[in-house]
């Protein structure tokens, strides 16, 4: 089939690689290059880098709603669109272009976690199981009927990053299994139950601010769900520190009380339970083991950490 692939981050690369092996990619549509890092150097999306390495034609439109992209893609006479974490909502004129429709690989079991950050919110909300859904796209936000789904467990130490690395190839395999049924018209569609829908909006930096008044299990899920971005943050001796690799450990204390260095890292009491962070990163410093950091920045046990958002 003649396919236009929409995608941007690393998560979308396995799906593009799989489709390119079996079908003709007539265009790869991805986000524009954007400044990144302290130097503000332009960085290309992972999908663009992969596509160029494979000799695939790349489009990076600044706008998708002015009709220009729809006209360009219509001229390519695509059979269908495959959309994987593109990062923009496609307007009706684009959705109407492919003969066999636009299809999305969404990283949740729809209708749960509709939106831009389904992997992150599944971890933050403490879900035990998630998955990927192949969905026929329509104008609503991830509201289209499902063609296929596959499930995966969320492991106790999963971060959003590690979970994404497992879901990406799972989605690619499910897509390859589903495309033949789309092509021959035998695909069976299941309408979503909108009453059961939950949302997964884009994350903001505030979503990483930890509140140790919450139970340790809630703090742990939040810290893992915002890893790698925006990162879990706490106020440590007046500085905003990022913390990583949480483990729930035995102990007790006041919420926000530093209990000292344990085998799993810096231990901090929560509303109920205790959490230990194995690695810490101070502003302008590299991420390092808690033991190494505390050797140069000792914290007296019994210290009560301040809150980034005191409300």
Could you say what each language-model-derived stretch is?
Residues 1-42:
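N-terminal Rossmann-like dinucleotide-binding module
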Residues 2-4, 26-29, 57-76, 81, ...:
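Internal alpha/beta domain cores that form substrate/cofactor-binding pockets in large enzymes
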Residues 7, 28, 51, 81, ...:
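A residue-level signal for conserved active-site and pocket-lining positions in enzyme catalytic cores
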Residues 13, 17, 70-74, 176:
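Amphipathic, non-transmembrane alpha-helical secondary structure
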Residues 13, 41-44, 66-70, 88, ...:
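Structural motif corresponding to alpha-helix initiation and N-cap regions
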Residues 30-36, 43-62:
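Conserved nucleotide-sugar phosphate-binding/catalytic loop shared by glycosyltransferases and other
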Residues 80-199, 204-206:
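Donor/substrate-binding cores of folate-linked one-carbon enzymes
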Residues 207, 212-311:
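An anion-binding loop in the catalytic cleft
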């Amino acid at each position: 089939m003649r396919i236009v692939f929409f995608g941007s981050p690393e998560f979308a690369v396995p799906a593009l690689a799989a489709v390119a092996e079996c079908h003709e990619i007539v265009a790869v549509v991805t986000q524009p290059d954007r400044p990144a890092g302290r130097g503000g150097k332009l960085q290309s999306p992972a999908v663009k880098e992969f596509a160029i390495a494979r000799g695939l034609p790349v489009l990076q439109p600044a706008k998708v709603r002015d009709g220009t992209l729809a006209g360009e893609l219509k001229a390519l006479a695509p059979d269908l669109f495959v959309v994987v974490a593109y990062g923009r909502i496609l307007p009706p004129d684009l959705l109407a272009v492919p003969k066999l429709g636009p299809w999305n690989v969404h990283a949740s079991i729809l209708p749960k976690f509709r939106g831009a950050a389904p992997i992150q919110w599944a971890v933050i909300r403490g879900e035990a199981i998630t998955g990927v859904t192949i969905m026929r796209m329509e104008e609503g936000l991830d509201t289209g009927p499902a063609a296929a789904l596959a499930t995966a467990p969320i492991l106790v130490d999963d971060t959003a990053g590690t979970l994404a690395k497992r879901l990406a190839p799972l989605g690619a395999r499910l897509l390859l299994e589903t495309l033949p049924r789309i092509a021959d018209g035998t695909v069976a569609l299941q309408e979503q139950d909108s009453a059961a829908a939950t949302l997964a909006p884009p994350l903001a930096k505030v979503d990483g601010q930890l509140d140790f008044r919450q139970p340790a299990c809630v703090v742990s899920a939040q810290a893992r769900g915002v890893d790698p971005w925006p990162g879990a943050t706490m106020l440590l001796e007046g500085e905003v520190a990022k913390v990583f690799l949480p483990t729930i450990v035995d102990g007790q204390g006041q919420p926000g009380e530093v209990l000292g260095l344990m085998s799993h890292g810096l231990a901090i009491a929560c509303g109920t339970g205790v959490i230990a962070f194995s690695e810490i990163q101070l502003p302008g410093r590299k991420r390092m083991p808690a033991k190494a950091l505390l050797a140069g920045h000792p914290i007296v046990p019994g210290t009560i950490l301040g809150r980034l958002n005191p409300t």
